[in-house]
């Protein structure tokens, strides 16, 4: 099921920055936010508790990638934090992903990273030594993720149709690299607009700078939300 709220990436370095940003929104506006490595490593689990305490939903984007036992234990901790969604690297393998699912339990959604949106096909060939197309690599990871019993994947919106065709329409596709029409590309090479992502079948979209660095973050969020919901 498509999430009607665009996820806001809280890419801030401090707790105070997060508090200041979220304070701009009225209490009745319940957001879905992404907490990534920078913020989580700077502040720790308390940032998740704080955001959840405000009534917002949390996608904890830590991209775990380790041996199955370690990932399982870490997921048990994240489950106790009350996260709504978290992720692992699909490259960790099916057994690692199964262990992650077991550790997290059945409540939160668990998705896997396929290829980062900053990765070009040339980089994948030269550095990862994967000699298929980028799209084929992503679909392969998605099929293995489904095999492991996870809910979906993080992927570029460009791969959504192929992924759902290879798995199922219920398989979740969360797409970063979303930018409102006319905005700067930044460091992500494969981008789409919210309207494009909706049309192509994305279930979740993630935006950071177009909202967090906007002159009026609330207006920017509402405009993107309206575009996402058509």
UniProtKB/Swiss-Prot annotation:
**GO biological process terms, semicolon-separated:** 'de novo' pyrimidine nucleobase biosynthetic process; 'de novo' UMP biosynthetic process
Pathway it acts in?
Pyrimidine metabolism; UMP biosynthesis via de novo pathway; UMP from orotate: step 2/2
Residues that bind substrate? 11, 34, 61-70, 117, 179, 188, 208-209
Q: Which organism is it from?
A: Streptococcus mutans serotype c (strain ATCC 700610 / UA159)
Q: Name one GO cellular component term.
A: cytosol
- One of the record's GO molecular function terms: orotidine-5'-phosphate decarboxylase activity
Q: Which UniProt keywords apply?
A: Decarboxylase, Lyase, Pyrimidine biosynthesis
Protein name per its UniProtKB record: Orotidine 5'-phosphate decarboxylase
Q: Which family does it belong to?
A: Belongs to the OMP decarboxylase family. Type 1 subfamily.
